[in-house]
Regions:
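C-terminal His-loop and adjacent cap/lid subdomain of alpha/beta-hydrolase
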Residues: 1-147
Length: 147
């Protein structure tokens, strides 16, 4: 109860909150975070939640980092732009880097419940590593594919 009151007060005061969760986190279930965000939205109202919060699930990412997914995302800059310039984040960019820090793959990091879907040309190994080859889609909605 106390946490809900704190979050409600934070949002009512104009606070901004970005929540990120690794989709393959074995330590903390993403389902618990989905439930928390759903309850928070009910508590503060859908309009207030949409104006003050963003929720991202990083597919294939373990607890905080690692896994098969793209675990590098600049959430701090997104939050700073939102707070200082009023530019609310939408789709962010998630990256996978090699041991030397070189980017080897970029994908869109979609707002939950959307997820990235490949829309690029078939049988093109170079394009499957490009953010532009993916679109955020809602569950059950098929994206328009490039042919």
């Amino acid at each position: 109860v106390c946490c809900r009151q704190l979050v409600r007060a934070f949002i009512q005061a104009g606070g901004k909150l970005i929540v990120w969760h690794g989709g393959s986190d074995a330590a903390l279930s993403v389902n618990s975070t989905i439930e928390y965000m759903t309850n928070m939205e009910k508590s503060v109202g859908a309009e207030n939640a949409a104006a003050s919060t963003r929720f991202y699930v990083a597919p294939g990412v373990d607890h905080c980092e690692g896994g098969v997914g793209e675990d590098k995302t600049d959430l701090l800059t997104a939050l700073d732009q939102w707070v200082t310039k009023g530019i609310a984040p939408a789709t962010l960019t998630a990256q996978r880097v090699d041991a030397n820090g070189a980017v080897i793959l970029t994908l869109p990091l979609c707002q939950y419940p959307q997820c990235p879907r490949y829309i690029g040309p078939a049988n093109n190994a170079a394009n499957d590593k490009l953010r532009s080859s993916y679109a955020c889609t809602s569950p059950g909605v098929e994206p328009k594919l490039e042919i």
